[in-house]
């Protein structure tokens, strides 16, 4: 670190936070660690994790940052660990609303009909993300809207399970398993509804990006997702039951007034709280003051 003239070590991997804080301390430079999610410890390791946090902060002078209200509260209330809250961010030059002409042009490019009702999820396939819940309700959704399509972006440990479930339910031709995509906005702007069914999040960056594209969001009411409605109604928060997805989608399709309000509130909120230039400046100040 001294040889390369490093001024700050910013660590994101939880298993490295104490080690990197020690390295920074020995090198006489500043260190920052970012908590990205609402972690919980097993009873046997709880006190150890509290000690790691306390010693890194008080003995090694590491500054702790959290990315959302839920993560901040989790650290403060569960681990008795005060942190500096600086929200995550998105780039508004990469994620922005589409007009009708662009939406239809991209739908044509992707082979999606003008009158299709498109739902989308974006994220790695895992037990935490619970994409199974979305697939399970497709038969019920198709009873009301036969031209429905589910754009499934992401892959991971449960991808094959999800494909097997789709075949079992006979809805595989209504799902496009797109895997990981670089041009996520292209898929967001052709969608009518964004879904996130996680057990928990730190803060969902893909939800921020969807709201920035003015796509209405239906979210499970869990830590890291309920943050989006902390100030006002910016999404539809629903209980953690797949059947609630059907009710929420029907509500958005039949109540245009509430849908437009959610879109407006969500867009204004992410531009205010998760705007890249503003939050990056806060990170830079943290580096200078750490």
How does the language model describe each region?
Residues 231-243, 251-257:
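Conserved acidic donor-binding segment of nucleotide-sugar-dependent glycosyltransferases
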Residues 30, 39-60:
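Nucleotide-sugar donor phosphate/pyrophosphate-binding loop at the beta->alpha transition
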Residues 216-219, 229:
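Short hydrophobic beta-strand element within catalytic cores of glycosyltransferases
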Residues 180, 199:
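Aromatic "clamp/platform" in nucleotide-sugar-dependent glycosyltransferases that forms part
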Residues 96-112, 258:
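A short helix/loop element that forms part of the nucleotide-sugar donor recognition site in Leloir-type
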């Amino acid at each position: 670190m001294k040889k390369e003239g490093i001024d700050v070590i910013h660590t994101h991997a939880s298993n490295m936070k104490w080690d990197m804080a020690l390295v920074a301390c020995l090198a006489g430079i500043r260190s920052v660690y970012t908590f990205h999610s609402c972690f919980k410890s097993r009873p046997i390791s709880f006190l150890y994790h509290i000690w790691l946090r306390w010693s890194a902060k008080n003995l090694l002078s590491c500054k702790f940052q959290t990315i959302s209200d839920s993560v901040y509260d989790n650290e403060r209330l569960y681990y008795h660990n005060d942190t500096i809250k600086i929200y995550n961010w998105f780039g508004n030059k990469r994620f922005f609303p589409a007009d009708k002409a662009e939406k239809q042009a991209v739908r044509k490019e992707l082979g999606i009909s003008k009158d299709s009702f498109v739902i989308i999820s974006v994220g790695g396939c895992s037990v935490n993300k619970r994409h199974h819940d979305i697939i399970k309700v497709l038969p019920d959704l198709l009873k009301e809207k036969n031209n429905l399509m589910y754009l499934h972006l992401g892959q991971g440990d449960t991808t094959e399970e999800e494909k097997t479930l789709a075949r079992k339910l006979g809805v595989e031709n209504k799902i496009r398993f797109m895997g990981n995509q670089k041009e996520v906005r292209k898929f967001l702007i052709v969608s009518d509804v964004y879904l996130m069914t996680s057990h928990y999040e730190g803060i969902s960056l893909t939800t921020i990006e969807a709201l920035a594209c003015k796509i209405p969001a239906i979210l499970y009411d869990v830590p890291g997702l309920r943050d989006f409605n902390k100030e006002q109604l910016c999404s539809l928060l629903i209980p953690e039951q797949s059947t609630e997805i059907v009710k929420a989608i029907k509500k958005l399709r039949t109540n245009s007034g509430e849908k437009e309000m959610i879109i407006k509130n969500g867009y204004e909120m992410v531009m205010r709280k998760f705007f890249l230039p503003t939050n990056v400046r806060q990170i830079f100040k943290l580096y200078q003051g750490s």
